[in-house]
Amino acid sequence: MNKLFALFLLALCFCGACSYTLKIKDGRTAYERKQFAVAVPMLEKEVAKAKTRVERGQLAYLLGDSYRRTGQDKRALTWFKTAYDNNYGADALKAYAFGLKKLERYAEAREAFKNLGIEIGSPYEYRKEITAATIAEDWLKQAPANGWKLEDAPFNSAQNDFAPTYFADGRLVFTSDRAMAKSEGNYNWTGQKFMDLFIVEPEAASPQVFDGQLNTGGNEGTACFNMAGTTVYFVRAVGAYKGDDAFCKIYLAQKSSAESAWNDPTPLPFQKEKINYLHPALSADGNTLYFASNDPEGWGGYDLYSAQRNAKSESGWDEPKVLSRNLNTPGNELFPTLDADTLYFASDGLPGMGGLDVFRTYKSERNAWAPPINLKSPVNSGSDDFGFLPTRGAKLPAATKPGDLMRSGFLTSNRTGTRGGDDIWRFEQRVPPLKPPQRDTAPTKPLAYKLLLEGYVLEKILTAPDDPNSKVLGRKPLAGATVVAEAAGGKKQTFTVKEDGFFKMEMGESTDYTFTAALAGYLSNNAKFSTKGIAKDPTNPTQTFEIEIVLDKIFRNREIVLENIYYDYDKWDIRPDAEPTLNRLADVLRQNPGIRIQLGSHTDCRGNDGYNQTLSQRRAESAVNYLISKGIEGARLAAIGYGETQPADPCACARCTENEHQINRRTTFKVLE
C-alpha cells in the first residue's frame, strides 16, 4: 500500500533515524537507516555517477523516496519519473502516479494509474484511484462556491507545525520541530529538530515552548487537555527493544491546579507492546478518550478507537473499542478532534483528493456513527490535510443569509503555499450564495434504507509466478471462487464469483458477518464486516461498502518466509513482535483444516555448526508450540531446524554483509503433501 502519510505519523514513530550518523558512507545505507535527510545529498551525487541504467534507476528511486519522506513532493516526482524511465519498474510508476495525485495533477494521475494497471496485469487494482481523481477535479472546480476561506496562521515556521489543540485559557498548543525545540541535535529522518509541544495565542506570531516536564530531547506531540487544563494526554516515541524502531505511546500527566507543575508523565495502561497509539482527543466531560492505533485486531492500517474511564476498573479504564466500520477502513484513520457531538478525523482510506482528507461524522439518536462526510476543497487538497479544530466555545448568531459566518478554526496541511512542511491554517466558512430554487413535483416516498456490500475475491500477482517469496506487484480478480457469507446467528448465503471476482449482497442492521472464500489450489481466507454502529442517513439511505478477500496459491513443499519473526541473541523464545505473524498463520490453519505444515528455522553462517543446528531446532519447536497454544493440533505441525545449511543468500561467510546475514536468518513454513 502506497498511501501518503502526514510527516509526523511517519517520522515520530521511528528511532532508526536518530541524530547520530554512525559510519554512513553512502546514500543507500542512509536510506536503509531511515536517515532520509542525510541520504538526499549523498544520493544526488551517486545518481550522477551511476555507470549503468539499472544502477541509475535504483538510486533515482531511493532519492525520490527520500524527498517524499522529507516532504519535498515536487522533487520526489522528478526522481520517480527518472527511476521509471531507467527501467526501475512498477514501484516507480506507482510512486509517480500517487505523486501526481498529491500535486493535484489529476488528469496525468489518471493516465499513470491506467498505465500502472496495464503494467502489472490488473486494471482492477487502481480503478478506485482513477475514479477518485475525477471526483477530486470536480471538487476543485466547486471550491470557490463553498464559502470557505483559508489563510496561513501567523505563528508558523519554516519547519513543521501541526495538530493544534486548545489549552484551558484559549491558547493553542501544537507540535513543531522548529529551531526552538529542546533537542540538541537534528533528527536525521527530517533534517530538523526533534518534535516538541509549543503554546501560542491564536493571533500571535511568537509561540513558546510548552513545558519542560513534558518535552524531552526526543519526539513528543499531538496533545489534548481537559477543560480545566489540569490533565494532558500526549504522544511520546519510546524504544521497546535496543536497535529496533521506536513505538508511539499516549502518556498522561496531571497537576493539582493551573499554577502547579505537571507530575511525571505515565503511559496509559491499556496500550500493547509493539503497537502505535497516536493522536489523543478528549471528550468535553473528560471521560472518553479517542485515539488512533495500528492494532492488528482492528479493521486495517490505523483505526480510530475510544476508551472510557472507569473508576471501578483496576487500570482506571475500560478496554478500548474500535469505532464502527463505516468510519474505519483498511487504510488509515487518524487525528480525531471533537466539537460537541461532532467528530472530525483524517483518512486516506475513504474516497478523497490525494493524501489524508478531513471528514466529519456525528452520533445519531441510536448512538451510532453517521456516514462520514468529506469536507471537500478547499479544506481538503491533494496533499495531507488533518487536525481540523473548530474554534472552541464560539457562540455565533444564526447564519441565515449569504456571507454570515458559520464556523471558524484551524487545520493542518502540507499543501502548496506552506512556509515549511506541515503548516497550521486558519479557516472561516460563511453561508454561500443562494442557489435558484428547484421545483420538485414528485410525491414524497418513504425512505427505504439499505446496507449493501460489494465484495471481490482476488489473488496476488507475483513477480515470479512460481516463487511464493517473490515480490507482490498487485492483485487481480480470481474467477470461480466460492464465497460463503455467514451472519452472526447462523444465516448463510453462498456466491460463486465469475471473471470479475465480484459478489454483492444486502446486509442486515447491527449484524456481524464473516465472508469465507475458497477455491481448489488456494488457501481459504475470510474477511469480517459489521454493520453495528452504522447510523441511518436520510441524505444517503442506500449505503454501499466494500471488502476484498485475497486467496494465496498453495505451493506444496516450497518454503515461504514468515516476515517479522526475530529472536534475541542465543534465545528461542517467541518475542511479542513475532506474535502477530504467528497469529495470522494460526488463522490460516484454522481456515484450512485439511493441510499440514512444516515450520523451519535457519541461522546465518556465524557460529559453530552444531550450535546453530541446535539453536534453529529449538526456535522451530518454539514456533510450533506457540501455534499449539493457539489451538492448532500438534499432528498438523512439524518442526525442523536447518542451522546454516540452506542459506537464502549463499555469500562467502567472511564477506557476507549484515543485510545478507539477516536474509539468511529466517523462519519459514511450507505446506506438506
Give the ranges of each region predicted by the language model:
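Short, conserved micro-motifs composed of acidic
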Residues: 21, 33, 95, 102, ...
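Periplasmic OmpA-like peptidoglycan-binding domain that tethers envelope proteins to the cell wall
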Residues: 347, 352, 592, 600-673
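Periplasmic peptidoglycan-binding/tethering modules of Gram-negative envelope proteins
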Residues: 434-596, 657-658, 673
